[in-house]
A protein has these predicted regions:
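Short, Lys/Arg-rich, polar N-terminal cytosolic tail immediately upstream
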Residues: 1-20
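Alpha-helical transmembrane segments of integral membrane proteins
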Residues: 13-15, 276-282
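A short amphipathic helical element positioned immediately N-terminal to and/or at the very start
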Residues: 14-15, 57-66
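Membrane-water interface segments at the C-terminal ends of transmembrane alpha-helices
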Residues: 21-55, 67-181, 209-229, 259-278
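Glycine-rich helix-loop "coupling/hinge" segments at transmembrane-helix boundaries
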Residues: 54-55, 134, 228-253
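Glycine/proline-centered hinge or cleavage motifs at structural transition points of membrane proteins
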Residues: 194-195, 208
C-alpha cells in the first residue's frame, strides 16, 4: 500500500514539474492543436458526412455505397494487392536484412548496399511508378529499344504490386535488420557447434525468433499498400483500388457523402490491422 502511494506521489510530482516548464507546455499545446486541426477535425467531418444526411443519422449512405459494383470490386482488388505486397515486401526486406547482418560486405559494397536499400524511402512516392513506365512500358527504354518488345503492358495488378513492393520493402528491411541484430548470437553458435548447417540454423533458430517481427513487417506494409494512392493512380490503369475509387467518387461523381463512406470502410480495415498488430503480435 505504501509503495503504491509513493508511486502516485512521484507521478504527481512529475506532472507538476512538467506543467511548470513553459517550453514543454507550449510544445504539448502545439502538438494537441496540430493533431486536432489536421487529424481529429478531418476525421470528424468524415464521420459526419458518412453517417448523416438531410434526414439525420442514417446508414443509407453505406447501403448505397455497398451496392456499387465498382466499390465491391475495388475492395477485393485492394485486399489482393495488399496481401501480395505485404508478403513480397516482407520476404525482400528479410533478404536485405539478412545479407547486411550476416554477410560480410566490403566498405564500398556495404555502403552501396545501404544506399540502394534506402533509396525508395527518400524518393517521392510516384517516382518508381514513372520509372516503371519509362523503362518497361510500351515505349519503354528497355522493352522497346533494347528488347524490341512493343506491346508490353505494365499497368494493372502486377504493375501496382511490383512498384509497391519496391516502394515499401525498405520499411521491412529496417524493422527486420534491428530484429536480427538483437538475436542472441550464442543461440546460433550453439546450433552450429552441434553440426547444424547455416540453413538449418536459420530454419530452427533464427526464423522462429523472427516470427513476431515478420508479422509486424507484413501488417505495416499491408497497411501502407491499401492506403497508397499515388502508385495505383499512376500505374493502376483500369485496376481500381479503394484509394483511387474514393478519389474518383469525389472528382468524377461529385459524391462527397459516398466518398466519405468509402473512406470509413478503408479506415476500418486499417484500424482492424492495427488491432491485430497490437493485441496478437506485440
Amino acid at each position: 500500500m505504501t509503495e503504491v502511494k509513493t508511486k502516485r506521489q512521484s507521478a504527481s510530482l512529475d506532472r507538476r514539474k512538467l506543467l511548470a516548464d513553459p517550453i514543454m507546455v507550449t510544445t504539448i499545446v502545439v502538438l494537441i492543436a496540430f493533431l486536432t486541426l489536421f487529424i481529429l477535425y478531418p476525421l470528424a467531418i468524415l464521420l459526419v458526412d458518412s453517417f448523416y444526411s438531410k434526414n439525420g443519422l442514417t446508414l443509407g449512405i453505406f447501403k448505397r455505397v455497398l451496392a456499387m459494383a465498382n466499390f465491391r470490386t475495388s475492395i477485393a482488388n485492394t485486399l489482393k494487392v495488399g496481401f501480395l505486397v505485404g508478403i513480397l515486401s516482407t520476404l525482400l526486406g528479410l533478404l536485405f536484412a539478412y545479407v547486411e547482418v550476416y554477410v560480410k560486405l566490403g566498405k564500398f559494397s556495404g555502403g552501396l548496399f545501404k544506399v540502394v536499400s534506402m533509396l525508395p524511402v527518400v524518393s517521392p512516392p510516384f517516382v518508381l511508378s514513372l520509372s516503371m513506365i519509362m523503362l518497361f512500358g510500351k515505349a519503354g527504354l528497355i522493352t522497346r529499344f533494347l528488347l524490341k518488345i512493343y506491346d508490353n503492358n505494365v499497368y494493372g495488378f502486377w504493375g501496382i504490386a511490383i512498384v509497391q513492393t519496391l516502394t515499401f520493402f525498405p520499411v521491412c528491411y529496417m524493422m527486420l535488420k534491428g530484429l536480427l541484430k538483437n538475436i542472441d548470437p550464442s543461440l546460433e553458435e550453439a546450433a552450429r557447434d552441434m553440426g547444424a548447417s547455416r540453413w538449418k540454423v536459420f530454419a530452427t533458430v533464427t526464423f522462429p525468433l523472427m516470427l513476431p517481427g515478420l508479422g509486424n513487417a507484413f501488417l505495416v506494409t499491408f497497411i501502407e499498400s491499401i492506403a497508397d494512392f499515388a502508385n495505383p493512380m499512376i500505374i493502376g490503369g483500369s485496376y481500381d483500388t479503394l484509394a483511387t475509387t474514393i478519389y474518383l467518387q469525389i472528382t468524377g461523381a461529385y459524391d462527397k457523402e459516398g466518398a466519405a463512406a468509402m473512406a470509413v470502410v478503408l479506415l476500418s480495415i486499417t484500424l482492424l490491422m492495427f488491432a491485430v498488430q497490437k493485441y496478437y503480435l506485440e
